Amino acid sequence: MPRVFGHYVPARLLTLAAGEAAIVFGSVFLGLALPLVGFHVIRPAWGDGFAPSMVLTTLVLSMAHIAALYDTRQDYGRAELLLRLTIAFVAAYLVIAMLGYFILHLTLARKAFLLSFVTAFPASFLLRLVHGRLTAQSRARRKVLLLGSGEVSQMIAATVRASRHTYEVVGRLDANGRGGDGSDGVWSLGTLEDLDWVSKVTRPDVIVVALEERRGTLPVSEIVESKLQGTEIEDWPNFYEKLTGKIPVGNLRPSWLVFADGFKPARITVLTKRTIDLLVSLCVVVLSSPVMLLIAAAVRLDSPGPVFFRQDRLGRFGRVFRMLKFRSMRADADTSPPPPDAPDPRVTRVGRLLRRTRLDELPQLFNVILGDMSLVGPRPEWVALVPEFKAKVPLYLHRLAVKPGITGWAQVKNQYGATVGNTWDKLEYDLYYIKNMSIFLDMLILLHTVQIVLFTKGSGEWKQKQAPSTTSASYAG
């Protein structure tokens, strides 16, 4: 699976996105050229089409992502594919039309604009039909041979079965040849010393080293020979990261964290990220200020108490800051016990609407402007919960290496909550983000977030409560 700025992206998605980008980009210049056929007019300045074609291509790919057209878990029929693609293209072309009204360099002639749409849209639809058929025909599962039979090996086998990636485990080898009876779906094929002939028989595409004890047992010569024959050799943490988008905290050797790539973003990445945070936050605050004033008035009229909810959260390097949200619960919610699974009576009428639309998060833009938070990063933890998590979750404080965010990798991967179990899972996603932090990954997370807000009702990642009375309750996160 190839990596884009450190983030794993399936090859079939890269080819689809590249093809779609080429179609949209080329359609703009086709739209500029076609009006010239049969006419004695001055040839257009082709350089003038570069900026709008680049922006339009970015918009189409972004809207397609928001419409879940790059979601490998989905298998749309032709009717739904056509509907989603129509929404994505219409939205993208409307945005470029509005941008062209304000920015001269993004303006397209009306005929070029229409010709671009009527050529790019059907071509993209046809591309997706052909691409879907070709990938379905060539989606042979890649064979994986596991070295090891312990907990780590079993976890990798379970992860492969649960994933939608094109892998299948053909068997495992261990030190004594007693790697299992197939009860977990994986049979033992012999000992580690049998790697040479087992590889010739099973012809694995990938050998995953999942040995919990390697000293004196790792068949180095046979592994090198397999690598020379073209077989991929993967250490199990890297393979797990590739499949899940997580760093496996529980079984990880400390040395892996020390020597693994990543965990140190380039200075230009940090500066660019901060610049984007400031520009986007300032623009959104200005544009949404009328909405925020209306929300503030509605909160005050709906229930007595302050407009904003403030809570101490842990920021980068453990610095405490006050996080802002629009208040969505009664002002006395701090002292009332959390309800059972029934709807929380402490949430106000306006609060329910704010939570459903995530508008209660808007004031956190001020935290971003002040430098306490970023648009993207691990969610800031409530200070009162940190001691418990620090004691029970390994490597927990490593998530403080970057600024917390309004949204994050864990949230778009459907992980939210304040129990130790949820926090453990969130940490694995957070560490993946910290290891592979890039502007590309930030943009991907923001697009995922927009998709969730627009198309997912009651998503668990932002179901929040503002003030628990016990550390195991969920909270305003």
Identify what each model region corresponds to.
Residues 1-23, 27, 75-77, 126-289, ...:
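N-terminal hydrophobic signal-anchor/signal peptide
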